[in-house]
Amino acid sequence: VLLLSDSAPIGLLPRRLAWDVLQAVAAGAYADVALERVLRERDLKPSDRGLVTELAYGAIRQRRTLDAWLDRLGKVPAEKQPPKLRWLLHVGLYQLLLMERIPDSAAVNTAVELAKTSKGLARLAPVVNGVLRAALRTREAGETLPLPNDLPAQLAQAHSLPDWFTQLLIEWRGAEGAAAVASACNRVPDLDLRVNRLRSSPPQVQKDLAAAGISSEPIVGCPDGLRISGHSGDLRHWPGYAEGHWCVQDCSAQSIAPLLDPQPGDRILDACAAPGGKATHLAELVGDQAEIWAVDRSAGRLKRVAANAARLGLASINALAADAANLLEQRPQWRESFQRILIDAPCSGLGTLARHPDARWRVTPQSIRGLLPQQQALLDGLLPLLAPQGVLVYATCTIHPDENQKQIQALLKRHPSLCLEQESQLWPDQAS
């Protein structure tokens, strides 16, 4: 436990919280969950919330680059550093080498102070000071990290990605395309809102936000979407949030529900539904006049579906905690009863590394292979629930063909009566 005194340097708390997030992620937590927890526990001003987010997500995103600098600047390789020290040095190095508006003294002094006041690290405060000051000298001398000779390793180090992933990118897209995707994986993602047309309209929400000093613009090809620029602060305090005028949803995710072409009166099944972004979108598209079943294995996560539906004023969504792949066994009366089925399948998430920076360090070729049987089980298990002439949409947020095109090709071979109506893939460098 780290206690901060009144005489602690200004800006210590945001850096400490970012350090907490890095340690939690290294211990297996998801970055967005860990970040949300530390922000919820503290009543921070908007600028400090923004700093915590940028430091945590930025240092996680650039873990490989920061480790390479640690290997060069320290006497002990990054992998062999005490974990607490390694992640604290990442927070400091990220500010010095990869951020522009942070004073050098603030980056160094806060890191040294955090070491001094942290149990087990006090004796290593001089190491923190030495490494960060060495980084300053290196930066002032204009020195850069040497790149490996082979292209996959070059791309991986330059963009802080695993070698196996850049190797695949080159196979899929060629050298130039791979570089474009790798660069897109490190882009700071936009914040997109989806306007609830049952309660407001995009122009009205835009006007309400502008009155609170929040600028937004419509998203091309996304009729209900607004993109926020330069945001900070707690979104729950923004105009229209409590009233259910809008929710947060990435523009690419907003494109999924319309593919089902849902109609009022339909029975609609959303498998793997939590936290409810697509289920609520489906309800909005049919004017809340449908029977929608939001199914998820996690009863805890389903509570978020219910909470989001309630805030948006939607009454057509029924939540069910169940394994969607075995739904027919639990509800045999549901056979051929759904006009629309959405399978938002569990996947590697390789298309969303910009939004989920920790995924690049968690996903492995082995973990992807482990997902393939789950995806197949969902497709085969839910197909009998589809009514004649019904529509099934299989959606993922990955770019791996084994999880996408190959799953659908195999499904069509197993079920020749199916007709493929539409197939499309968006790459991270092509996203709007």
Question: What annotation goes with each model-predicted range?
Answer:
Residues 1-432:
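S-adenosylmethionine
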